[in-house]
Regions:
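Glycine-rich phosphate/adenosyl-contacting loop at the front of the ribokinase-like
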Residues: 1-74, 257
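Short glycine/proline- and charge-enriched loop/turn segments
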Residues: 18-26, 104, 246-251, 311
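Conserved phosphate-binding/catalytic region of the ribokinase-like
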Residues: 3-5, 206-313
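Hydrophobic anchor at the start of a short beta-strand
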Residues: 49-50, 76, 158-160, 224
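Short, conserved phosphate/pyrophosphate- and ester-handling motifs at nucleotide-, phospho-/glycolipid
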Residues: 43, 193, 264
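Conserved beta-alpha-beta core of the PfkB/ribokinase-like small-molecule kinase fold
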Residues: 129, 134-215, 219-223, 229-233, ...
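Conserved N-terminal subdomain of the carbohydrate kinase-like
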Residues: 49-132
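Active-site metal-binding loops of divalent metal-dependent hydrolases
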Residues: 10, 135, 266
Length: 313
């Protein structure tokens, strides 16, 4: 029985074949994607299979994603198929080693139509960890569903982990910072990168955990994980955290990166795997999470086979 539930989007990424702009690209490579999907797959690869609540269309792209998740060891109990909506698509541009840019086709697609209550209370009673991201908050149906899930998980003393992932192109007129503020009181731990924090209303030096963590603690989470790319990652927790008040930093690992897409998701999976496994030293948690993230970058694709994280240490 899984002790972790991950919830959110899965989609198909299309990457240009060759170094050409999207407007002039004739051929694309198809890959499975979506931050929560990447987290669920990485957890399975770390021998901690998680339930994954998502929704894809009853179309060939949905078939591709459902088959990929199953092949990667993700239990299919909460992988829903929508007969009335298509699967989300994203076209990726930019340098994969420095950070991708996305053009989304997501209006009314299946993952925006998550419905409250589809994960029953008995499933939440069975898990100890719930991981959600911010992308579902951009769409009204999914927003209600994720809020409901987080509130019920919080009421059952599950540890709720929130991946703060700013995608301005998805939000339109919806208030990103406001939606983040609404969900944070029910969140225990938040993971973010500096570029996510400004749009979420965090002020000051967003590369400095001592500057950003107090602002996030005030909003609810007792633990903050800040990823810093090649510089590593930092963490800070208050006395309300099960691991006590602490600060930690780890400088990361130098690897020959092929593709950094999904590195942050691998980091999240590493954090959850370490904490769910009983680790309470945040320095050790960061060491493990950075190793998982580094290992994930040496092969192309956010769901590619994961080398042994110990191999990069």
């Amino acid at each position: 029985m899984p002790d972790v539930l991950v919830a959110g989007e899965t989609l198909v990424d299309f990457l240009p074949e060759g170094d050409t702009p999207l407007a002039t690209t004739d051929a694309f490579a198809r890959r499975p994607g979506g931050a929560p999907a990447n987290v669920a797959v990485r957890l399975a690869q770390l021998d901690r299979p998680a339930w994954f609540w998502t929704r894809v269309g009853s179309d060939p792209f949905g078939d591709f994603l459902a088959e990929t998740l199953a092949d990667r060891g993700v239990p299919d109990r909460f992988v829903e198929r929508d007969p009335s909506a298509k699967t989300t698509l994203a076209f990726v541009s930019g340098d994969p080693t420095s950070g991708p840019r996305f053009t989304f086709y997501r209006d009314g697609t299946a993952d925006t139509r998550l419905e409250p209550g589809r994960v029953p209370d008995d499933a939440l009673d069975a898990v100890e960890w719930v991981v959600v991201g911010s992308v579902p908050l951009a769409s009204a149906p999914a927003r209600r569903a994720v809020r409901d899930l987080v509130d019920r998980a919080n009421a059952r003393d599950c540890t709720v982990v929130f991946d703060l992932n700013a995608r301005p192109e998805l939000w339109g007129d919806t208030d990103f910072a406001g939606e983040v503020d609404r969900i944070l009181p029910a969140v225990d731990a938040v993971k973010a990168s500096p570029e996510d924090l400004g749009p979420a209303g965090i002020e000051g030096d967003t590369d400095d955990v001592d500057a950003v963590a107090p602002q996030l603690h005030e909003r609810g989470p007792h633990t903050v994980f800040l990823t810093l790319g090649e510089a590593g990652a930092a963490a800070r927790a208050t006395a309300d955290a099960p691991w006590g008040p602490t600060e930690a930093f780890h400088g990361g690992y130098a690897v020959d990166a092929v593709d950094t897409t999904g590195a942050g998701d691998a980091f999240t999976a590493g954090v959850v795997d370490a904490l769910a496994g009983g680790e309470r030293d945040l320095s050790a948690v960061l060491e493990r999470a950075n190793a998982v993230a580094a290992a994930a970058t040496v092969r192309a694709g956010g769901m590619a086979d994961l080398p042994d994280p110990d191999s990069v240490v």
